Structure formats: structure tokens, C-alpha cells
């Protein structure tokens, strides 16, 4: 029987909660090898430390970290580590955490742990500090109270950004960017631009973890990624070039995809003597064939 491979077109969050069709490499151990073109220093994902540039995407994608809140498939905010929030006034937010949340090292993820993580975040991550505008954080058991320096109606949305993964600050961050989170996997080895090794979190608070070990291989070249999947060197691929898709449109492979909120856009120079004219900008916009962009440049995957 041929092993069916998984081709990840969109964010591969399915990894974190277990892939039931993952092939077992040993009778008593389920392992999974994942090829990714985006997990690299050039893409500002040099490690899995969410407080380092855009590495929060890798932290959350590979199941190491989780945020207080997250976006649903319909882009609605829903609880994750937190169970509810209250906007007390325009500067004050009270967040209540779920009971029983623990880090992978066994430490309880309570209000104090969240306070420490968020304080470290705004100290080390310029974009997060600018988004959140936190003035103070207080912790009382499983309740965290955040006061902002200015009204932040989108605070909960910002806390859902991957940079908001809650990590155990007391456990520290290794020299190669490994952190302790609350997710279903624990990172045991990381070499930037080469690989990440993950094992199941035996202390996971939110259900069973179905895969024992995951290896994420950084394969920055799309053609090389396609060859690796064809050769059976990896079980799934993320970030493959659209031109390679026809190679996998058969019964041996499955495409997994989801809609994204990501938007691609171009700026127009309002100070230019040409594009400062609204009529010119409108004409340029009308002349852009969006349908052809999707059907030709993206081969319909857009």
C-alpha cells in the first residue's frame, strides 16, 4: 500500500494536534518529517522564540507555543490559553485564564507566568510594544489585568498575534532560540536554516498528542522541496512553488489548504506629480487585472 503524503498549502497547524494518517516509522512510535521553505533566517524565522522578530510564526506553527486568544477559521477571536476577557474601561482589560494550563516543563501557566511573558515581550519586541501600548500588568491567581497607555480596542486581536505566544520566562531561552511553551510539542534541537526537532509534550493540558516526534527540515528552494516529497524523504511540504503542484495532483498526495487573511498590496507615492492625482490612481487601479494575477501568476491558488 502506498503511503499518502500531505502537501501543506496553508499554515500547517494540523501538525500541532496530530495527523492521524502519519506513517509510523517504528511499531510503537509515530514520527513525522516536514519540509518547510519559510523556516529560515532570511524569512526572519531563525528560531522559535516568539519575542524574536517574526519567529512567533514558527513557534505557533510547530506546536511549541500558544497565545491567550487565537483566530478561528472564520477569523473570529476565540479563547485559547485564556477563557474570557472583560474590557473594564477604555484603558483596562481583565483576562481570565483556563484552569489546568501548564508549560511543557510542568510549571503552571498562571497569571504570574503570563505577566512575566508579556513584560518580557514588550521589552524585547519593538513591534509588539508599539501594538500593545502596555502601561502595567497585574496578576492575581488566574486573572491578569492589563492597563494600556492609550485606548486599545484591538488589544485582544494583538494578543492573538504569534508574537504573543506565552513562554516560561523563568526557564529562559537557549542560545539557539528554544523556548518552553504550553503547546503539544517540545523542541529538543534547533539549527537555524537546517532543522528543528520536536517531541510530544507529555504534560500537554489540552488533549492527546498523536505524533511522538516531528522533524522540521528547512528546505528553502521550492524545487528541492518538491523533489524531497517525491522521493519520500519528507512526509509533508509547506511553501511549495505553485508550478510544482501538478506533480502531486494524484491519489498518492493530499492538498491541505485554508483561506488566509494575508493581503498583498502596492503603495502609490502621493507626493509624486503623477500619482498625487486621484484620477491617475483610480485609472491605475482599474487597469490591474486581479483575476489574471490569480489565474496566471498564482495558477488559481489565490
PLM regions and their residue ranges:
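Gly/Pro-rich hinge or "lid" segments in bacterial periplasmic/extracellular proteins
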Residues: 54, 76, 159-209, 213, ...
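Periplasmic-binding protein-like
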Residues: 271, 275-302
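Surface-exposed binding/hinge segments that line
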Residues: 86, 90, 94, 128-170
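Sec-dependent signal peptide cleavage junction
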Residues: 19-29
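Short, well-ordered beta-strand elements
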Residues: 29-40, 92-95, 114-117, 144-146, ...
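Ligand-site clamp/hinge motif
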Residues: 202-247
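Aromatic- and charge-enriched surface segment that lines or borders ligand/interaction sites
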Residues: 83-125, 274-276
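N-terminal lobe/hinge region of extracytoplasmic solute-binding protein
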Residues: 35-88, 180
Amino acid at each position: 500500500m502506498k503511503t499518502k503524503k500531505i502537501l501543506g498549502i496553508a499554515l500547517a497547524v494540523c501538525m500541532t494536534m496530530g495527523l492521524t494518517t502519519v506513517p509510523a516509522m517504528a511499531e510503537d512510535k509515530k514520527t513525522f518529517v516536514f519540509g518547510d521553505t519559510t523556516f529560515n533566517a532570511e524569512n526572519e524565522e531563525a528560531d522559535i522564540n516568539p519575542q524574536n522578530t517574526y519567529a512567533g510564526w514558527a513557534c505557533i506553527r510547530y506546536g511549541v507555543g500558544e497565545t491567550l486568544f487565537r483566530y478561528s477559521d472564520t477569523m473570529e477571536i476565540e479563547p485559547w490559553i485564556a477563557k474570557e476577557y472583560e474590557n473594564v474601561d477604555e484603558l483596562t482589560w481583565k483576562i481570565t485564564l483556563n484552569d489546568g494550563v501548564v508549560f511543557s516543563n510542568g510549571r503552571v501557566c498562571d497569571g504570574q507566568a503570563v505577566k512575566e511573558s508579556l513584560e518580557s515581550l514588550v521589552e524585547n519586541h519593538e513591534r509588539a510594544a508599539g501594538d500593545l501600548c502596555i502601561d502595567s500588568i497585574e496578576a492575581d491567581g488566574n486573572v491578569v489585568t492589563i492597563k494600556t497607555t492609550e485606548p486599545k480596542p484591538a488589544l485582544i486581536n494583538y494578543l492573538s498575534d504569534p508574537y504573543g505566544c506565552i513562554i516560561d520566562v523563568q526557564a529562559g531561552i537557549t542560545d539557539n532560540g528554544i523556548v518552553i511553551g504550553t503547546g503539544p510539542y517540545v523542541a529538543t534541537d534547533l539549527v537555524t536554516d537546517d532543522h528543528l526537532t520536536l517531541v510530544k509534550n507529555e504534560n500537554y493540558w489540552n488533549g492527546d498528542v498523536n505524533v511522538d516526534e516531528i522533524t522540521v527540515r528547512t528546505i528553502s528552494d521550492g524545487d528541492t522541496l518538491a523533489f524531497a516529497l517525491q522521493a519520500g524523504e519528507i512526509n509533508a511540504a509547506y511553501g511549495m512553488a505553485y508550478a510544482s503542484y501538478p506533480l502531486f495532483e494524484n491519489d498518492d498526495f493530499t492538498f491541505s489548504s485554508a483561506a488566509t487573511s494575508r493581503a498583498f498590496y502596492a503603495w502609490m507615492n502621493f507626493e509624486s506629480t503623477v500619482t498625487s492625482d486621484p484620477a491617475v490612481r483610480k485609472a491605475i487601479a482599474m487597469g490591474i487585472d486581479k483575476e489574471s494575477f490569480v489565474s496566471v501568476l498564482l495558477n488559481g491558488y489565490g
